[in-house]
């Protein structure tokens, strides 16, 4: 099943640098069962057991994390 998820094409995340992407990967993997994958250096997201609302929450969280100071 993991291979099917990895092969699935999804839209790239826009405007995130590597550090922000790593922070999101750690947080989202533990909170929402979302996994960020890289395809040719472009960050991409695929969902495992995640509903459409969780994917929408990921998009809003991405913007929030990008605008936050750590």
Swiss-Prot record:
Keywords: Host cytoplasm, Host nucleus, Host-virus interaction, Phosphoprotein. Phosphorylated by host PKC. Phosphorylation alters the stability and may also have an impact on the subcellular location. It comes from the Viruses. It is found in: Host cytoplasm; Host nucleus. One of its GO terms (cellular component) is host cell cytoplasm. Its main location: host cell. Alters the structure of the nuclear envelope. Involved in the perinuclear-nuclear localization of the capsid protein VP1 during virion assembly and maturation. May contribute to viral genome transcription and translation of viral late proteins. Plays an important role in the release of progeny virions from infected cells and in viral propagation. Interacts with VP1. Interacts with Large T antigen. Interacts with small t antigen. This is Squirrel monkey agnoprotein. It comes from Squirrel monkey polyomavirus. The lineage of its organism: Viruses, Monodnaviria, Shotokuvirae, Cossaviricota, Papovaviricetes.
